[in-house]
Amino acid sequence: FAIRRQRQMCIRDSYISLPKFYIDFNDRKSRNSANDVKNEIIKLKNNGIVGLILDLRNNGGGALQTVVDMTGLFIEKGPIVQVKSTGNRKQILYDKDPQVVWDGPLVILMNKMSASASEILAGALQDYNRAVIIGNEKSFGKGTVQNVIDLNRFISNSSYDLGALKITTDKFYRINGESVQLEGVKSDIVI
């Protein structure tokens, strides 16, 4: 997580690099990338920034609820992503908070290694016409949701750590209904 402030030709733009959508599973409410980015944006606004660049290049994803919360920093409220599980059971995840932390110009940088949660954020903000996506022709194209199961919670073993199992449980779709699986999020400006 890095922040760089630049001043060019009397225009103030700020840059936030986000390598993944992290969360502390022991303190989900306060220790996550959405809260950290929110706090940084508030500081940057107090310093008079005019534009914001969010760098998601090489961001392979992360916690689903964190990306929903982060998307909510840039829109009033509404659907963020559709999640479909076995049997085509569909759940729509919403931003329910009408507070917008940043409503100014927003650029998202992506590349071929931007995947999963990065594609949820970029796709939703593109669907809301809220951000300009700049990068490779398209992002990675990972339209699936995975869950981590801590095996130590299910099997009693005091001798050693049993580890965890990561399984794919759902597919996700943009709010416009499109899948990013193998297709990715297409950049508005290709560099």
Give names to the regions the model predicted.
Residues 4-8, 12-155, 171:
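Cleft-lining beta-strand/loop regions that shape enzyme active-site pockets
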Residues 148-160, 187-190:
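Beta-strand-rich C-terminal secretin pore/gate domain
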